[in-house]
């Protein structure tokens, strides 16, 4: 059995059409059919029921899942070798989930156009980003918390206004609010751990205005917090860019307080002048123009 057998079968399993699979593989249909038959002979079982419509056998479904894993490992092996030989580049990016709505998406789109660049995208909190940068697991990171670490350089890319998230039928959901109006509400904060986190940014915002809030529920993820708001557990604050996630069971309400913002912060290793990191900085600067 050779890797080409796995690649041929994978495409056939995904198209369930010999003609279409042959076109995608840039081979004629008869050779493809022979290759699949050879594979079945080697395995001692049928993988495909050759009827209309074409369908996979139970063994075929299992073999498809396993062959995808093998091909993925082969791809990892090939790319690792090419990166080591300087034929490809690798860029590790860490990001807090809420930064996916602003700045980061356009950067990823630009970088993905480079066929010789392998991207590693890692969802992580700001604290996790710092450790990953120090260990070399990632090269740049996007978060929302300022960290004082001599090994890390941070750059504020923009200030994202905060908005309140309220249940659809909440009496305060009809017009812009002040923090003082929200202070008496039960709050859902996220993430619960590790700290400090975006949650501490929200707590500090109220403390700066001489107020404290009652946290009725902690959540680990932004979307979990919004879901809990929808069912009436409490209210929360999110960056305004999150409003791109439309829901019919909540209301996003603007805040009138001028300081109610959350920064998007780019973090990288201090002194890192690698070409790929400099390229990212250039692309980000171009976005801001």
Curated annotation (Swiss-Prot):
CDD domains xref list: PBP2_BenM_CatM_CatR
Entry-linked Pfam families: HTH_1, LysR_substrate
GO terms of biological process kind: catabolic process
Domain HTH lysR-type: 1-57
Assigned keywords, A-Z: Activator, Aromatic hydrocarbons catabolism, Cytoplasm, DNA-binding, Transcription, Transcription regulation
Stated name of the protein: HTH-type transcriptional regulator CatR
DNA-binding segment(s): 18-37
Residues in the signal sequence: none
InterPro entries to which the protein is assigned, alphabetical: LysR_subst-bd (IPR005119), Tscrpt_reg_HTH_LysR (IPR000847), WH-like_DNA-bd_sf (IPR036388), WH_DNA-bd_sf (IPR036390)
MF terms (GO), sorted A to Z: DNA binding; DNA-binding transcription factor activity
Function: Positive regulator of the catBC operon that degrades catechol to acetyl-CoA. CatR binds in trans to the catR-catBC promoter-control region in the presence or absence of inducer but only activates the catBC operon in the presence of the inducer, cis-cis-muconate.
SUPFAM superfamilies assigned to the protein according to its UniProt record, in alphabetical order: Periplasmic binding protein-like II, Winged helix' DNA-binding domain
Similarity annotation: Belongs to the LysR transcriptional regulatory family.
Location(s), subcellular: Cytoplasm
GO cellular component: cytoplasm; protein-DNA complex
Subcellular location, principal: cytoplasm
């Amino acid at each position: 059995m050779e890797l080409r057998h796995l690649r041929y079968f994978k495409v056939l399993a995904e198209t369930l059409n010999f003609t279409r699979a042959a076109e995608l593989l840039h081979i004629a249909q008869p050779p493809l059919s022979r290759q699949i038959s050879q594979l079945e002979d080697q395995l001692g079982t049928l993988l495909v029921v050759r009827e209309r419509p074409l369908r996979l056998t139970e063994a075929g479904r299992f073999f498809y899942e396993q062959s995808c894993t093998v091909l993925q490992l082969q791809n990892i092996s090939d790319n690792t070798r090419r990166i080591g030989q300087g034929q490809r580049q690798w860029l590790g990016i860490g990001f807090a989930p809420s930064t996916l709505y602003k700045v980061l998406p356009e950067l990823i789109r630009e970088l993905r156009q480079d066929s010789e660049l392998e991207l590693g995208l890692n969802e992580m909190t700001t604290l996790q980003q710092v450790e990953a940068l120090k260990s070399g697991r990632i090269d740049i990171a996007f978060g929302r918390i300022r960290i004082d670490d001599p090994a890390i350089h941070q750059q504020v890319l923009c200030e994202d206004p905060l908005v309140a998230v309220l249940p659809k039928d909440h009496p305060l959901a009809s017009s812009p609010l002040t923090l003082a109006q929200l202070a008496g509400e039960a709050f859902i904060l996220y993430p619960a751990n590790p700290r400090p986190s975006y949650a501490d940014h929200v707590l500090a915002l109220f403390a700066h205005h001489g107020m404290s809030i009652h946290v009725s529920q902690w959540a680990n993820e932004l979307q979990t917090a919004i879901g809990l708001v929808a069912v009436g557990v409490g209210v929360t604050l999110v960056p305004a860019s999150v409003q791109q996630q439309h829901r019919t069971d909540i209301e996003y309400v603007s805040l009138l307080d001028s300081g109610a913002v959350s920064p998007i912060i780019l973090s990288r290793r201090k002194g890192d002048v690698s070409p790929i990191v400099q390229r990212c900085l250039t692309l980000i600067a171009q976005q801001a123009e």
